[in-house]
Structures are given as structure tokens and as C-alpha cells.
């Protein structure tokens, strides 16, 4: 109990089932907030990519397996009908869970998560990612509010989830002040962003860009521009 972890989960067949748009961001943020509160898991960083998810969390009560099962199940139940599909939403393997043993491990993985869209050649800065992405400035700040998506969840009834869920991004334990940790995250993130830009320039390539990311088909593994983001 009390360990910190990098948690990752891929969509089935690497399909872009979590392609970023307002509905997907609202849904995942809401369910993450609900799950974190229910299982008392502390969230430090999150990035929802088109075909996978990364979280950095601390698990004070050793409830991480229940947390991931609950979150993954609700995301699948909501997104599948939204996409007009009924097959498995997630890849058959379970979530990848990597224990973070030192403060340096935690800092490195938080920066890794936030730099994911940049390292993948999608956007030049992590903050430009149109999906759910936790900014360093949100660490230790006011909770982020997500309204319950009315397009899937019941508004009334004994089993109804809360109308508003609040996600609080907290500083990992043992890493000093909030301000110091934010600065360290920003510095590490910027270093990755600079390296990614240099690598693309060397390869004579460009970042894909938000418009093309959102125009990808949810069901393609490659870059297949078909329609605008409507899910």
C-alpha cells in the first residue's frame, strides 16, 4: 500500500477508439474522477491518447486492481455503443502496471505521460493535445469538474452516478513542495518536447497536428483521414 505506479491500457487492435474530442474527454475525465474517489487512488498525471491511456497514480489502500477494472469497464460500456460497436474495447492483456520506486522514477514517468502526444509526433507541445491531458499547473490546484455525460448515464435512480465528479491532481508523496514539483515536471517535459522536434526535423518530418488527429477513423490503425470528430 502507498506505492506509486505508471498505469497504461491499450484499445483493442490499437484502434483509435479514444480519438480526442469533447465527448470522449468529458466521459473519461468524469469516470476517472469517480473511480479515483471511490477507490481512494491519488492521480498525479493523465493522458488519453487515441488508442491508449497513461496514468501516474499512488495507491494508498492497495485498491489499484479494483480501480482499473472499474474504470476500464465503465469506459468500455459507454464508448462501445457510442461508436456503434459491441466487441471488446480494450486489448486482451490487462493494464500494464509499472511500480515507481524513487522520486526520480515518478518525475520521469509524469513527464513521459505528458509528453506522449509529442513523442508520438502528433503535436509540438503537450498542452496542444486535444484529448484529456493534465497540465503541470493543475497539480495541487483546484479540482477539475466533469459533468456526468447525459448521453449514456441515467440522470435518476438509486444507481445513478453523481451529477458532477471532481478530479484533483495531487503531488506525489515525498517530492517536496507543489511549486518545486511543477517546475521539475515542466523542465523535464520541455526537454522531451525539444528532443522530439529535433528528431522530426532530422527525419524531415512534421508533427501530424490536431486537425489530422481528430480526422482519423476510430477503427484504423494507420493514418486514415475519413471524417471529423463526432464521437
Question: What residue ranges belong to the model's regions?
Answer:
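Short catalytic/metal-binding and nucleic-acid-binding patches
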Residues: 1-231
